[in-house]
Amino acid sequence: MRTGTENRPSRSGMGRQKRGKIMLELKDLCLSADAEGGKKDILDHISLTVEDKKFIVITGPNGGGKTTLAKTVMGLAQPTSGSIFYNGEDITSLSITERARRGISYGFQQPPRFKGMKVADLLQIAAGKKLSHDAACSYLTQVGLCARDYVGRDVDTSLSGGEVKRIEIATVLAKNAELMIFDEPEAGIDLWSFARLTETFQQLHDRLEHTIIIISHQERIIRLADEIVLVANGQIAGRGSVDELYPQILTETVRGCNMLEVDKKC
């Protein structure tokens, strides 16, 4: 199945552009956790800037610190040291709720379920306002769900992991946040829905209304990026455009670990 992105040139091939406003800045972030034999550095002096309205894909080997890095930005994990600046404001000590109010949203790799809550109600809570039936259905359609079959369902164990994942992504879209972070949005999603999802990410970026950070190993998502950030062993192992880093991702590994999942069916 084609997504309409296979023959599209990568954004990095469109020429260098003048650097824009810095939306997110991570300064010397460290995060340690208890491990056998002492402390383990999950994040090891990470510094990173993300420009406004850019599409960034963070990739790298499993266990390298990608999810922890994203959770630290959202406030789900607290750094041992270092600082996080969002639109020039130090948000290191702010709560998840305070960061959400400032315009940061997060799509979990393994979303929670909410027994007794309808999908339509969850979308309305995410949007922070009353949603029409058509608006709620639109968000579900964008993530490859048949809206009429899901809008009235409970967000409970009757839904598969892939269904809950897509509903979670729909809530992030409904929030319409300035900075959208998605942790492996492709996980547990079927091929057709994934194709629809990549189109949605492309459309979001084309509108130039949001900054998007996606953690992914998926080739088609990586190819959508303005910039790739490689994270391994808690450090930034590389950063650059798709043209600069994609050949390395295809042919090399970071310290012996494969970084990429290539969908050979498409």
Question: Language-model features: where?
Answer:
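Q-loop/switch helix immediately C-terminal to the Walker
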Residues: 110, 116-132
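Conserved structural motif at the start of ABC-family nucleotide-binding domains
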Residues: 24, 42-43
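ABC ATPase NBD coupling module
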Residues: 90-105, 249
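Helix-to-loop junction immediately C-terminal to a conserved catalytic motif
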Residues: 74
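Conserved ABC transporter NBD signature motif
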Residues: 82-89, 135
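Conserved beta-strand-loop-alpha-helix hinge in the C-terminal portion
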Residues: 235-258
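Walker B catalytic motif
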Residues: 184-185
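The feature captures the beta-strand-to-loop junction immediately N-terminal to the Walker
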Residues: 59-61
